Amino acid sequence: MNTVLIIDDDKELCALMKKCVEQENLSAVVAYGGLEGLRLLEENKDTCSLIILDVMMPDMDGFQVLQKIREKNNVPVLMLTAKSDEEDKVSGLRLGADDYLTKP
C-alpha cells in the first residue's frame, strides 16, 4: 500500500490530513517533528509515495529535513506551511520540494 508521510508539529492539522489521506484508501503515518519524520521515512522507505512537510517545527525546520531527505531519497515532497514569503517558496523548490503550498 502507498504511504503518505505527514511531518508537522500541529497535531490537529496532522489528524485532519491523516483522515483525508485514509479516505483515499492510502496509508498515512504522522511525525510531529523533523527528526521523527526522518526516522519514519527510513522505516517506510519502501512504501512511502509522498511526504507532506511543514517548514516551521521546533526540533529541525522543514528546509533542513528536506535537505536530509534529498541526500537519500527522491520521494515527492509537498511543503505545506504558513510561511508565504516568495523567498521561502524559492528556497523550498531549490532544495528539491516538488511543490510549495501555503496554509490559510
Predicted regions and their residues:
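Acidic catalytic/metal-coordinating carboxylates
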Residues: G33-E36, D61-Q64, I69, D88
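Acidic, metal-coordinating helix/loop segments flanking the phosphotransfer/catalytic sites
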Residues: V30-L50
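Residue-level signal for the "D+5" position in two-component response regulator receiver
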Residues: V30, D59-M60, E86, R94
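Two-component/phosphorelay signaling modules centered on CheY-like receiver
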Residues: K11-V29
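Receiver (REC) domain active-site loop signature in two-component systems and cognate sites
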Residues: V55-M57
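Conserved phosphotransfer cores of two-component systems
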Residues: E42-D46, K68-V75, L95
